[in-house]
Amino acid sequence: MIYGIGTDIVSLKRIIRLNKKFGQAFAGRILTPEELLEFPQAGKPVNYLAKRFAAKEAFAKAVGTGIRGAVSFCNIGIGHDALGKPEFFYGPALSEWLEEQGISRVSLSMADEGDTVLAFAVAEK
C-alpha cells in the first residue's frame, strides 16, 4: 500500500552556486559518510550532489515529514543495486523511525537532462 509520494526538481546552477559558496561543507551537510567517500570519484560531481539532494528531498516528501529529526540528509543514503538501479539506504535512527511508522520500502527514480535533475520517491507500508 502506498504511504506517500514525493518528487523534487533541482537546477544544476543552484547546486553549482551552493557548492562554490560553501565548498566541502555543502557536500558534508547533504551526503552520508559513504557518499562522501564516493563523491571525489564521481565523474560529474555537481550532478552527484544534485541527484542526492533531489532524492533526499523527494524521500522526505514521500514520508511526509520534510527534512527533520531522523529524516535528515545524513541519515538518507543513495546507492545502487547489482543492476545499477538507484536505491535508498538508511542510518540507524532513520531505520528505526521507518519501522515505527510501518514504512517497509521507499523506491527511488532519478533523472537528469541538461540543467535539471529530478527525483521521485514512493514510500510503501
Curated annotation (Swiss-Prot):
GO-annotated molecular function: holo-[acyl-carrier-protein] synthase activity; magnesium ion binding
Top enzyme class: transferase
SUPFAM superfamilies per the UniProt record, alphabetical: 4'-phosphopantetheinyl transferase
Location in or out of the cell: Cytoplasm
InterPro entries membership: 4-PPantetheinyl_Trfase_dom (IPR008278), 4-PPantetheinyl_Trfase_dom_sf (IPR037143), ACPS (IPR002582), Ppantetheine-prot_Trfase_dom (IPR004568)
Catalytic reactions of this protein: apo-[ACP] + CoA = holo-[ACP] + adenosine 3',5'-bisphosphate + H(+)
This protein's record includes keyword Cytoplasm: yes
Residues reported to bind Mg(2+): 8, 57
Record GO biological process: fatty acid biosynthetic process
Function: Transfers the 4'-phosphopantetheine moiety from coenzyme A to a Ser of acyl-carrier-protein.
Similarity annotation: Belongs to the P-Pant transferase superfamily. AcpS family.
Protein name per UniProt: Holo-[acyl-carrier-protein] synthase
Annotated source species: Neisseria gonorrhoeae (strain ATCC 700825 / FA 1090)
Gene that encodes it: acpS
